[in-house]
């Protein structure tokens, strides 16, 4: 997760000096980014519990481990923001324009075999408290919790693979901020007072860039796997239903109106002119976007290698709705 965060921060920090921003471009850019991020959250919340065995067996079989992964959102979602803020993509990060911007995720995940019937239960949890990264070049917070129950249609034995179906629930919430990202104040061009058509200067002093997201997702999945000596390849498919995801981004800064803090009436006029999806206060300009409740579809698969009771899983996933990619690594102890 740390590597994916570093890539994202380097991407955001690749900025030069500039003086003025077109507000319409800023609004459109952040609105597009927030929409694409909210659309990609159900996919990101699926990180964890995608272990190679389609069924681990009944109790006392169990396992616990750590999963680290990332999913992508299309680069086009962020390119409008970069254009509006005068940010250029560094040449060493050109691969992002092709594969997308990585959004990291991690979980501690565990599975326990069921009693009497052939099922297993999984739980996962990931948490990065606000303030843990204080003093770094960025701030981040992260929370992911979820679980599932899988029922074995077939058990792995002889030439027969294991096949299971499962139902799960995931909730994800997080945010990232980059203080002092932009060099110097930003001017928002040509604010016109509708009362007298006079032009005024809006300026953001020492702005910081921030993003926030949350989603609640129900998931139905099926998986097939086959243990061959020390290896277990697997494939799966999932249909998820999002109850609605929310994502947003913007700038936190002191807003100045002709060089002074705006009054309540001036803020009301500014919001009237630029409002809608944008929320403007004297401390921030942010855009929030909700994705409608709906279905999402993904395929996943990978391979695990085990020595005695230690397993290493390498997995990949593809989201059909957003064309996003995902990858994860899981290290666990399982009996």
Explain the meaning of each model-derived region.
Residues 1-4, 155:
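Positively charged n-region of N-terminal signal peptides that target proteins for export
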Residues 12-19:
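Sec/Tat signal peptide C-region and signal peptidase I cleavage site
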Residues 20-148, 153-155:
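Transmembrane beta-barrel domains of Gram-negative outer membranes and organellar outer membranes
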Residues 21, 291-335:
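Predominantly the C-terminal beta-signal and adjacent terminal strand-loop region
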Residues 60-62, 104-110, 143-149, 216-222, ...:
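Hydrophobic, lipid-facing positions within transmembrane beta-strands of outer-membrane proteins
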Residues 62-66, 119-123, 147, 161-167, ...:
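Transmembrane beta-strands of outer-membrane beta-barrel proteins
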Residues 68-72, 114, 125-131, 153, ...:
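Transmembrane beta-strands of outer-membrane beta-barrel pores
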Residues 74-84, 88-101, 130-142, 170-218, ...:
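Extracellular/periplasm-exposed beta-strand and loop segments of Gram-negative cell-envelope proteins
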